Amino acid sequence: MYEYIKGKYIGINKDYIIVDNNGVGYKIFTSGNTMANMPKPEEDVLIYLTQIVRQDFIGLYGFLTKDELEMFNKLLTINGVGAKASLSLLSICTVNNLKYAIITGDEKTIVKAPGIGKKTAQRIILELKDKFKSTDISKGNSEINNLDVDYDEHSKKLEEVRFALNSLGYSEKETDRAINNVDKSEGIENIIKSCLRFLMN
């Protein structure tokens, strides 16, 4: 039903973002990767969408890139892999890294995602391996490994920032909002200082 939405980025919550389009705020569930790359609030953004309709739930899921949306949809075709598990995978892996893990049969990377056990990881590899080629990965193996290291270090850095802010009494929602509004390329100490300045304003 939906292809994409273009509007003003309003903010982030635990597992979704809010985009305003013509005065209507759209709640869009998304991955950690997309959340980490969102612009600053009030800036325009384009999110590629898919809608999931169940008997007890209707929700929008969206991503900054078509590649991530396509990977999300492919994961949903696998028995036992729902939207939550798919988002979990796309939060601990970039699309390139996940494709590489599937092509090479790397279960260890896939089971790092919360909600993904060994059998599910094996099923993902079995059912999707033939759908990807090495040429689908836009970076070489050495760069893939560098991406892994960079992403792991980035995630670890943000976790330390979250822990520090939570220890100071800030809620998860306040912490996520602050992190989303500061420069995350700086060192941990500077990110914490920037977050505190944001929260105190």
UniProtKB/Swiss-Prot annotation:
Residues 144-154 are annotated as: Flexible linker. Its main location: cytoplasm. Gene3D superfamilies: 5' to 3' exonuclease, C-terminal subdomain, Nucleic acid-binding proteins. One of its GO terms (cellular component) is Holliday junction helicase complex. Residues 154-201 are annotated as: Domain III. GO terms for molecular function: ATP binding; four-way junction DNA binding; four-way junction helicase activity. Has three domains with a flexible linker between the domains II and III and assumes an 'L' shape. Domain III is highly mobile and contacts RuvB. The RuvA-RuvB-RuvC complex processes Holliday junction (HJ) DNA during genetic recombination and DNA repair, while the RuvA-RuvB complex plays an important role in the rescue of blocked DNA replication forks via replication fork reversal (RFR). RuvA specifically binds to HJ cruciform DNA, conferring on it an open structure. The RuvB hexamer acts as an ATP-dependent pump, pulling dsDNA into and through the RuvAB complex. HJ branch migration allows RuvC to scan DNA until it finds its consensus sequence, where it cleaves and resolves the cruciform DNA. Belongs to the RuvA family. This is Holliday junction branch migration complex subunit RuvA.
